[in-house]
Amino acid sequence: KFRGYLKQCEQDLVAYAPDVLILVDYAGFNLRMAKIAKERGIKVFYYISPKIWAWNQSRVEQVKARVDRMFVILPFEEEFYQKFGYAVDYAGNPTADAVAEFEPTNDFFERNRLDANKPIIAVLPGSRKQEIEEMLHEMIAILPGFQEYQFVVAGVTNLDPNYYRNFHRNGIRFVFDQTFDLLSHARAALVTSGTATLETAL
């Protein structure tokens, strides 16, 4: 399937012959597309750098050879690429900006009917049904060993609130679209990988 999609995109690229190919994230696929484009003399712009600083720094040379202009969303990525003589553009990060502007509310416990005397463990299972179904049961399975805490799940309103009833247990509460507030009041957090990890770290 992967190779089929790659071949189809290559055919479309050749047929359309754009001046610039703009790629977004998804390194496994897009670095291959970047190579195909460069071989055909098409400029390549890339938004959201592959996380090569974390898993394979030797691939910087591959990026330099295939990408004409890289737009990064993490400030330290600029410095990382500079070490290899590759200039990139910091495009900013909506999540980092939102966290910087956020101010915790004083009535979080009262508004959500939480116990102000019991520390919170925040549970961030993601925002898509598939990842929630894969992760949330596993996350809340540890609850019996932490009775002195209240587990609060960060729900999202793009899903039907009734959907979360599948995960109701004694000792588990849900709040919706209040992730930053929840994290700011939590003692610890269980987090699915992805944007939520960045939100928690910030």
Set out the residue ranges of the language-model regions.
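Glycine-rich phosphate-binding loop signature in dinucleotide/nucleotide-binding domains
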Residues: 12-17, 114-117, 185
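Phosphate/pyrophosphate-binding betaalpha-module
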Residues: 135, 140-141, 159, 167
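Active-site and donor-binding regions of nucleotide-sugar-utilizing enzymes
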Residues: 1-110, 124-135, 146, 156-158, ...
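A donor-sugar binding/catalytic signature common to diverse glycosyltransferases
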Residues: 176-202
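Charged active-site motifs of nucleotide-sugar-dependent glycosyltransferases
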Residues: 115-122, 149-150
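Nucleotide-activated donor-binding/catalytic signature segment of Leloir-type glycosyltransferases, i.e.
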Residues: 163-178
